[in-house]
Curated annotation (Swiss-Prot):
Active site: 207, 236, 253
Disulfide bond annotation, renumbered to this chain: none
Official protein name in the record: Erythronate-4-phosphate dehydrogenase
Origin superkingdom: Bacteria
Keyword Lipid metabolism assigned: no
CDD domains the UniProt entry points to: ErythrP_dh (cd12158)
Binding residues for NAD(+): 146, 174, 205-207, 231, 256
Subcellular localization: Cytoplasm
Length: 381
């Protein structure tokens, strides 16, 4: 069996070497010619996998080590009998850590207490749902908009218009869909963006085209009271440089790039492939996951909950380095910037997740215990 994998997918050898011959190449360069003789294709979101790519090839399994599937032509897979798998939830914790880091950075710049703001989460699937749990666990006021879930579950949801009208912070976590009952392409269009509350913060760590980038650029030029955090961009790896300059935090689609999430994605695809072929997995992620570099953190019982929150979040992620690296990359011509975007992602340093932290509190303080519990860190007793 022959396997072609995006070169940026980790642990491919460890999980798939016993199943066939592995070849790697950059995801954006995968084309029909590269698939000659290939049975299994392993990709990320940068590779569009559709009829044009696959027709006439021997590929019978496609695995994407990502949550989203908007780059896969699932209808064609079904028509052609091609098995496929994604990695739902693999990087959810990493994205939550990213959002928390950005919230802390914004609060510091604006001199505002996060506990006093009202949060709106648009899209409450694997990522957004986890974020809602964390924010509510911290005791913060959260509104949730998720029309597909609202049709299946009773209560607890609000409309998008209510989120825009009522929330000071809006974080987007929807898939990208162009049609259907709940299309999300330009979900935040010019009209909806114009309705943002004074001083609102908008965070997009979902898909670039969920927000009309040109409309957001125009709005930020007119509304200096607003703050924008963008990790995803329309037309990636091409980026609107003027829009990036106007964002408080701008990063190159790395919100979910925790080491844990990347390895989890490969493990999930391996498990899905084995299930589809009736094989017993011979490798477990726990055998390959490295231990955290930070062994643990200890707090006195007198510590302030807000300071503890900031310390724990920044122990795993602070967006300011990624923001600075990204801004330095926005030089040169379009081709140079596109190459720099991909290079930042390819060479991204190892980042761990909050739930890998071990925390000790010297004494009894229920407020501190609540912070640890909300974040999902491990409390040592």
């Amino acid at each position: 069996m022959h396997i072609l994998a995006d070169e940026n997918i980790p642990l491919v050898d460890e999980f798939f070497a016993g199943l066939g011959e592995i070849r790697r190449m950059p995801g954006r360069r995968i084309n029909r010619a590269a698939l000659e003789g290939v049975d299994v294709l392993l990709v990320r979101s940068v590779t569009r996998v559709d009829r044009e790519l696959l027709q006439g090839t021997a590929v019978r399994f496609v695995g994407t080590c990502t949550i989203g599937t908007d780059h896969l032509d699932l209808d064609y897979f079904e028509q052609s009998g091609i098995d496929w798998a994604s990695a739902p939830g693999c990087n959810a914790r990493g994205v939550v850590d990213y959002v928390l880091g950005c919230l802390l950075a914004l609060a510091e710049v604006r001199g505002e207490a996060l506990a006093r703001r009202r949060f709106g989460v648009v899209g409450a699937g694997e990522v957004g749902g986890r974020l809602v749990e964390v924010l509510r666990g911290l005791g913060w006021d959260v509104r949730v908009c998720d029309p597909p879930r609202q049709t299946r579950e009773a209560g607890g949801f609000v409309t998008l218009d209510e989120v825009i009208a009522e929330c000071d912070v809006i974080s987007l976590h929807t898939p990208l869909s162009m049609s259907g009952d709940c299309p999300t392409f330009h979900l935040f269009d010019r009209q909806r963006l114009s309705g943002l509350r004074p001083g609102a913060w908008l965070i997009n760590a979902s898909r670039g085209a969920v927000v009309d980038n040109a409309a957001l650029r125009d709005l930020l030029l007119q509304r200096p009271d607003l703050e924008a955090v963008l990790d995803v961009w329309e037309g990636e790896p091409q980026v609107d440089v003027e829009l990036a300059d106007l964002c408080r935090i701008a990063t190159p689609h790395i919100a979910g790039y925790s080491l844990d999430g990347k390895l989890r994605g490969t493990a999930q695809i391996h498990a899905a492939y084995c299930a589809a072929r009736g094989l017993e997995p011979t490798v477990e992620l726990a055998q390959l996951m490295p231990g955290p570099a930070l062994a643990g953190l200890t707090f006195a019982a007198s510590a302030e909950p807000a300071e503890m929150l900031a310390t724990l979040c920044r122990a795993v992620y602070d967006p300011r380095r990624d923001d600075a690296d990204f801004r330095r990359s926005l030089q040169g011509d379009d081709a140079q910037r596109r190459a720099a975007f991909d290079l930042l992602r390819k060479a991204y340093p190892a980042r761990r997740e909050i739930d890998g932290l071990a925390v000790r509190i010297e004494g009894d303080n229920p407020a501190l215990t609540a912070v640890v519990s909300a974040l999902g860190a491990r409390l040592l007793r």
